[in-house]
């Protein structure tokens, strides 16, 4: 009975793909195999976490009667452009359930956004929820770039038996080397990354505005010593996580402890 109710609720939330998603998906098909099926969108799914908060997700639903494997994408950058077509519709039309999930404190998800901190536990809670879904057939893969790759390594710390593959793009399981390559603070790269994390889930215009603001103020920020609180010129406010990274250059809070060798534990 509970399974029937879940299926009914999922059907009621399912809508057609937005026009911009259909457009960019068509443009991205060039050179790819023809779509295997049509795709619908189930928006605003609430995934419960152990602390009582919920994380929001959208599911791109392949319109086929066959049981479909699931692709999990966990991101702090929002569930809109470009992830909606690039990972969502484009992969779903080849027979995958694509679950695009906003990480803690981003994109409407509950809790506080503390980069790199809760990804392992939240990923495991997501897998537990997946097991209860009538459309989940027990076959799981993950995909994503940059921070979306880090969320995959966080899951790989203790890979669930359902995990069959990971597609980690331009990412790392330890971001300390990104902040301090060779031991020196990478100011431009770090500030650019912070600008993206602070604004990308707010939509295209706020994101581009934040990047432009950083470009216009970077030279002034680079001349300011100490960098804390000088960097505020770039963002208009203080960023606690950035100050923690600057205050503890030898600490490695950004590592998952999952080295690439962890992939050997993923079920084949």
Which ranges hold each PLM region?
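Short glycine-enriched nucleophile-adjacent loop
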Residues: 148-160
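Accessory cap/linker subdomain of secreted extracellular hydrolases
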Residues: 2-16, 157-159, 165-266
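Catalytic nucleophile serine of serine hydrolases
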Residues: 146-149, 170
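Alpha/beta-hydrolase fold nucleophile elbow
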Residues: 134-147
């Amino acid at each position: 009975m509970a399974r029937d109710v879940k299926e009914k609720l999922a059907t009621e939330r399912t809508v057609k793909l937005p026009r911009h998603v259909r457009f960019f998906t068509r443009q991205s098909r060039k050179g790819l195999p023809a779509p295997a099926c049509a795709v619908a969108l189930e928006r605003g799914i609430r995934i419960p976490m152990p602390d009582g908060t919920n994380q929001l997700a959208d599911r791109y639903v392949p319109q086929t009667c066959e049981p479909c494997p699931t692709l999990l994408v966990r991101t702090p950058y929002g569930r809109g452009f470009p992830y909606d077509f690039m990972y969502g519709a484009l992969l779903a039309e080849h027979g995958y359930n694509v679950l695009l999930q906003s990480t803690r404190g981003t994109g409407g998800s509950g809790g506080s956004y503390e980069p790199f901190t809760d990804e392992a536990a939240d990923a495991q809670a997501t897998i537990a929820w997946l097991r209860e879904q009538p459309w989940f057939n027990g076959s799981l893969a993950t995909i994503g770039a940059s921070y979306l790759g880090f969320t995959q390594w966080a899951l790989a710390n203790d890979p669930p038996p359902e995990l069959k593959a990971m597609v980690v793009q331009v990412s790392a399981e330890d971001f300390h080397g990104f902040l301090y390559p060779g031991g020196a603070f990478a100011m431009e790269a770090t500030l650019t990354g912070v600008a993206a994390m602070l604004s990308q889930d707010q939509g295209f215009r706020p994101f581009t505005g934040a990047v432009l603001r950083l470009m216009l103020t970077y030279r002034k920020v680079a001349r300011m010593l100490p960098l804390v609180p000088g960097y505020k010129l770039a963002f208009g406010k203080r960023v606690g996580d950035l100050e923690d990274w600057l205050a503890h250059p030898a600490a490695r809070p950004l590592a998952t402890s999952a080295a690439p060798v962890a992939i050997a534990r993923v079920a084949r």
